[in-house]
Amino acid sequence: MTTDTIVAQATAPGRGGVGIIRISGDKASDVAMAVLGHLPKTRYADYCDFKSASGQVIDQGIALFFKGPNSFTGEDVLELQGHGGQIVLDMLIKRVMEVGGIRIAKPGEFSEQAFMNDKLDLTQAEAIADLIDATSEQAAKSALQSLQGEFSKEVHELVDQVTNLRLYVEAAIDFPDEEVDFLSDGKIANALYKIIDKLDLVQASAKQGSIIREGMKVVIAGRPNAGKSSLLNALAGKESAIVTEIAGTTRDVLREHIHLDGMPLHIIDTAGLRDTNDTVEQIGIERAWNEINSADRVLFMVDGTTTAAVDPHTIWPDFVDRLPSNLGVTVIRNKADLTGEDLMMTEEQGYSVYRISAKTGLGVEELKQHLKSLMGYQSNLEGGFIARRRHLEALELAAGHLQLGKEQLEVYLAGELLAEELRMCQLALSEITGRFTSDDLLGKIFSSFCIGK
């Protein structure tokens, strides 16, 4: 942990109405004495001159001093809030550096100091960057929930439950001569099942939070001339893709990034899937499958004039069999303007089926509502937390250890192995909040922050 005093511009570079210089560390009070001529009263706004070493006024503004540990970073912090001209701010930083023993902060270093001083955990620190980078109202709300500790609370509860169960299992191992067989009395199994159920709920919320942050990737797939490019244009609200009556017009991947009521959506239009000897088309089809395999959702586009079937296993079994087992599929029966089908949604064999006309726009609004629902629009209006991919990976790892532990208990009654899986689960969960996290990971996380944060 560094003990350096650091300085950086806390406001965005460039011209603005107000510019803020932030100093954190033991020398913050020395900077105040050198630049202001006095140490401001803690937590009081002090309007004063910011002076050079020769006594000339560089700027005028408000100085705020926070005595550690009662500050954002947990250290002494001085903020100089002056006019937002970049030249003035650069002069002020240069003046601060003249005090000696002070260096320019690295990206995210103020937040890193706050984390190191237990002022916030890692998910809260990440939420600061996510709040700054939010591209929608929903992302901002979710990031604020994480910043206020909602995600951390869920993870801490899981860690506590896993730790308590682990202690109970280890106690059962240490006292094998007791009359009660702790490993088979049902208490351990019931506690384990409750933890698994709780983790499933947190995983579901985290996945929604990740979609809010990163967007949901939706791939439009199907046979040539089913109307995939027309649907891309309808969802994007503009002519992004060339549409013709010639099958196989789209030979490469087309992407559009849109927002549905603040929810980010990445729409991928792909080449029509079919057997072909055309080398260029074969490459496009291979790329289409690459996109499908990494999608969050597939819109299976069907030309409604060619079949009355609604079950994808009936329409194209080979296509369905090749899809990843955990990939959600929505069936889109297109060209409803020609088939005369009612624009309704039905559930068929576990699949949502929509009838639309991508050409005329009929049914597209209902499809948008469906996509919003998949992204958790309503739940995020009510309040959710934001999550990153590393959080999802850690939760998945923890879930895997719980499932292995369940097997050790149910099949083998192996208490030692169950305890070890619980320990590994505990470590995976603790990495989310930063309780047990490598320095390399911390460096990677904080280096992505803005300078001055």
Swiss-Prot record:
Domain named TrmE-type G: which ranges?
215-376
Q: Per the annotation, how and in what number is the cofactor bound?
A: Binds 1 potassium ion per subunit.
What CDD domains does the record point to? trmE (cd04164), TrmE_N (cd14858)
Annotated residues for binding of (6S)-5-formyl-5,6,7,8-tetrahydrofolate: R22, E79, K119, K453
Q: Which Gene3D superfamilies match?
A: P-loop containing nucleotide triphosphate hydrolases, Probable tRNA modification gtpase trme, domain 1, tRNA modification GTPase MnmE domain 2
Cellular component terms (Gene Ontology): cytosol
GO biological process per UniProt? tRNA methylation; tRNA wobble uridine modification
Enzyme class, broadest EC rank: hydrolase
Q: Which residues bind Mg(2+)?
A: S229, T250
Q: Which domain of life is it from?
A: Bacteria
The UniProt entry, under Pfam families, shows: MMR_HSR1, MnmE_helical, TrmE_N
**Function recorded in the entry:** Exhibits a very high intrinsic GTPase hydrolysis rate. Involved in the addition of a carboxymethylaminomethyl (cmnm) group at the wobble position (U34) of certain tRNAs, forming tRNA-cmnm(5)s(2)U34.
HAMAP family to which the protein is assigned, alphabetical = GTPase_MnmE
Protein family = Belongs to the TRAFAC class TrmE-Era-EngA-EngB-Septin-like GTPase superfamily. TrmE GTPase family.
- UniProt-recorded name of the protein: tRNA modification GTPase MnmE
Q: Which organism is it from?
A: Shewanella baltica (strain OS195)
